[in-house]
Each structure stands twice: as structure tokens, then as C-alpha cells.
Amino acid sequence: MMRIKDLFPDASGSGRVLVLGELLLDFVPCDSDMRLSQPGTVLKTVSGSSGIYACAAAGFGLDCSFIGKVGSDPFSQLALSAIASRGVRTDAVVRSDSGQLGLAFLEYLPSGRNYTYYRDGSVGSQLRPEELTEAVFADASILHLPGMLLELNDSMRQSCFRAVELAKQNHVLFSFDPNLRKELRNDAQMRQRMMQMLSMADVIEPTLEE
């Protein structure tokens, strides 16, 4: 079983990994030749970069908690059950009586994968900074979040910076994935926010392109 201390000897806390983000549900065609405009069978699978990261961390045997927000809709319940079944703690997830989970529909084109999103105003993007509790950070060792959250909306952006603030106050290492999404935004403000996060990160996980 992997331990945080093996990876980061200077990490404090119990070894718990906190992953902040938005859960999504992907609809993936069983037949790679199927187009979204055609009838066919699809698989539902939990997604969102943070959800995937949390499941991977738990899969390596790490004690991992997801920090985010879900609704009372069936897709929210499915996504929450899916990450819990993979060993991810959900005690830090905020439950809302309103809002819908964001959905993504995938198709395979000759030019590559193509996603059609239904996520504007999704419940997962409505996490508020005051919904983060310091107790969650008290015994943690690492906080991880992806940079694309900074461009969803003001509420999620403020929640990200608040989470980093709580991490620093509790001597929790901050792991940051730039996760650049040019289709969301690419301007001076975005670059400024990205640089601000990078300057606070203890661990940075960029791709070769980034």
C-alpha cells in the first residue's frame, strides 16, 4: 500500500489526501462508430478531472476525501456512489436540495474525441467558500485541485483560493494541476490567477504541453 510519507517525507498530518473539484457524469458510446445523433447504447461513468484523480489516489491505497457539491438528482447520487465504491471518502461533500450534476456526452470522430457538455450552472460548480470547513483540513496531508476550476465562476474560484488558504493554515501540502482549458478562457486575468496558484503550490503536475 502506498503511503504519502513515502512520496513526500515532509508531509504532515495523517496521510489523508483532499481532492477539490466538480464531479461529472460521462455518457460513453459502447460502439466507437456511434454518433450522438444516432441511437445506440452508452455507458455512464463518473468523470471530472478531480473525480478521476480521487479515484486513482484511493486505488493506490491512499486515504482520500473528495471535496465538492452534489444535488439530490439521480445523476448526483450515481456519481457519489461511484466514487465511494472506489474507496473515496464522501464526508466532505456538500449536499444540495437543488441543482443538477453536470453531464458530458462523448463521441469518437476521425479527428479524435469530441465532448458535448451540459454543465452550465451545474450544482458541482456552485460550491461556496463558506461551505468549506477547517476540520476537514486539520488532519490532512495534501490538498489537490485542478486549474480549470478557476474559470468556472466566481463562487468556485473563491472556493479554490479559500481551500488553499485553509491548507496553508493547517500545514497541508498543496498539489496543483494547471489543467489548462483554452476553450474556457485564455486572457490576462486567467494567466494571472494561474500564476497566483502556481506560486502557492508545493507540488505542480503539468502535462508536457503545459
Predicted regions and their residues:
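Glycine-rich phosphate/adenosyl-contacting loop at the front of the ribokinase-like
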Residues: 2-89
